[in-house]
Amino acid sequence: MQGVQEQIEELQTKLAFQELTVEELNQEVIKLNQLIAHQQHQIQLLIGKLQAMEPSNIATQAEETPPPHY
């Protein structure tokens, strides 16, 4: 009977450690989800700023007049 009791206690100990590990992993997932949400918000802000930028007054290479030949 002692062997069965030891096995039960060992299983209970393992279960307690697994529950702790699951909780720690859950907290990490929550942190990562918050980080992802923050980064997505930052990306949306950057997209908005890029779209709001006015075009440059500098001519592109295609629009530039070719230099005179010597």
From Swiss-Prot:
Pfam family, one: SlyX
UniProt-listed InterPro entries: SlyX (IPR007236)
Family: Belongs to the SlyX family.
Descriptive protein name: Protein SlyX homolog
Native source organism of the sequence: Shewanella sp. (strain MR-4)
Lineage: Bacteria, Pseudomonadati, Pseudomonadota, Gammaproteobacteria, Alteromonadales
